[in-house]
């Protein structure tokens, strides 16, 4: 007999927290360096080795430098890690809508995310999924998550709320300059979050993510360029979602994915757009209006 596997606030927290926590922590941190290695004659450019400039660069790479919309997509595969052995579970296609607004002391980001689960290595939407470790077949239910608004200080640090989608959580993260090579710049975003889904006395849902974001250096340091396309890769280690019904099996979920950030909604991956237009046509038809709706409620 099949059970229901809700793609809900409790089992999308890995992807979502990684996205929401991009750029959080005590602040953006440029790499330690005695002096900027940028060639002379670039006066007026942002310096990635200066803390204030790096906060601006970080905002541009993660979102955009001015007010408006941007969009991110992610293709990933989820694995079960049990006794050092990886078992593919399924793949996923995620898309996120971001609206950025500058505030008096920083900026705020409103996010709406939509994830579709697919068969491993394909774009085929899953209506049910067989857990290879338990043998149980789980029916899939899907829904958008958000919109949720988070506030950032001018230095790039997040004003952490006390709850996330109605659940108490604790989080920390860092965003730092990883490397500059030629006309490429890389940032590392490491985040760690614990979501107390069953109250403070029960083990939390634990999300650890390592994200790498890459963009063109010339775009990043240009103070007149607020729209910097970027690519990203992520690796996550998460607790079992409750809805996987893993029982007493000891292990973790591993997610490996790649994606990008763009500024034209119609240039999101075609497979994701096709699913969104079929299943959530209201979001596809008017992404701006979707960001103004009341956040959907998801329960197991």
Model feature map: region roles:
Residues 47-50, 54-92, 96-109:
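Active-site-adjacent core segments of small-molecule enzymes
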């Amino acid at each position: 007999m099949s059970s229901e596997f809700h793609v809900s606030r409790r089992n999308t927290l890995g992807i979502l927290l990684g996205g929401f926590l991009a750029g959080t922590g005590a602040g953006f941190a440029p790499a330690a360096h005695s002096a900027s290695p940028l060639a002379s004659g670039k006066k007026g450019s942002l310096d990635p080795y200066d803390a204030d400039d790096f906060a601006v660069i970080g905002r541009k790479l993660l979102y955009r430098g001015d007010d408006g919309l941007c969009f991110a997509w992610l293709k990933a595969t989820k694995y079960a890690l049990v006794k050092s052995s990886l078992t593919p579970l399924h793949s996923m296609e995620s898309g996120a809508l971001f609206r950025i607004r500058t505030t008096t002391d920083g900026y705020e980001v409103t996010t709406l995310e939509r994830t579709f689960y697919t068969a491993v290595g394909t774009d085929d939407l899953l209506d049910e999924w067989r857990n290879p470790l338990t043998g149980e077949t789980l029916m899939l239910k899907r829904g958008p998550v958000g919109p949720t608004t988070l506030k950032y200080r001018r230095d790039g640090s997040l004003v952490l709320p006390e709850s996330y989608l109605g659940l108490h959580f604790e989080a920390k993260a860092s965003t730092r300059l990883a490397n500059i090579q030629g006309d490429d710049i890389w940032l590392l975003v490491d985040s760690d979050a614990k979501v107390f889904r069953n109250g403070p006395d029960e083990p939390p849902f634990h999300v650890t993510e390592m994200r790498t974001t890459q963009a063109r250096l010339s775009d990043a340091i240009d103070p007149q360029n607020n729209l910097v396309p970027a690519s990203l890769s992520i690796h996550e280690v998460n607790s079992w979602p409750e809805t996987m019904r893993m029982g007493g099996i000891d292990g973790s979920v591993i997610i490996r994915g790649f994606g990008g950030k763009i500024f034209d909604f119609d240039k999101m991956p075609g497979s994701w757009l096709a699913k969104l237009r079929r299943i959530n046509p209201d979001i596809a038809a008017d992404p701006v209006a979707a960001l103004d709706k009341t956040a959907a409620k998801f329960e197991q």
